[in-house]
Amino acid sequence: MISKIDKNKVRLKRHARVRNKLAGTAEKPRLNIYRSNKHIYAQVIDDVSGKTLAQASTQEKDLANESGSKVELSAKVGETVAKRASEKGVKTIVFDRGGYLYHGRVKALADAARENGLEF
C-alpha cells in the first residue's frame, strides 16, 4: 500500500537542505518566510548573532484590519518588512523561501520587498 505524502514534512526536509547552504550575516542578513494557511510571516535575521533585525506579518494590527486576497496582503507584508529593514540600514539580503515554491504569496512578498529597496 502506498503511504500518503505529508507535504509539510517534505517542505521541512527541503528547507533543512537549503538552510545548510544559506546563512545571513550582519552585512547580508537572511529574509525568512513562514506561510500558514491563513497568515504569512517574514523576518530579516542575522544568523551570526542570532538576532532578528526586522519582522512583519499579517497578524499585525495595521495589516490585520486590511481586506484583500492573501496574495495582496503578502505583498503588503513584503513592503512593510523592506521598509523596516531599510530603517535598520539593511540593503542587501539572502532570500530564504522556507522550502515553499517561489509562486503565489511567496513571490508577491519577494517582489514587494524588491520594489521597496531590498536587493537579492
Swiss-Prot record:
GO terms for molecular function: 5S rRNA binding; structural constituent of ribosome. Belongs to the universal ribosomal protein uL18 family. Gene3D superfamilies: 3.30.420.100. Part of the 50S ribosomal subunit; part of the 5S rRNA/L5/L18/L25 subcomplex. Contacts the 5S and 23S rRNAs. The keyword rRNA-binding applies. GO terms for biological process: translation. This is one of the proteins that bind and probably mediate the attachment of the 5S RNA into the large ribosomal subunit, where it forms part of the central protuberance. PANTHER family: 39S RIBOSOMAL PROTEIN L18, MITOCHONDRIAL, LARGE RIBOSOMAL SUBUNIT PROTEIN UL18M. Pfam families: Ribosomal_L18p. This is Large ribosomal subunit protein uL18. Transmembrane segments: none annotated. Keywords: Ribonucleoprotein, Ribosomal protein, RNA-binding, rRNA-binding. GO terms for cellular component: cytosolic large ribosomal subunit. The keyword DNA-binding does not apply. It comes from the Bacteria.
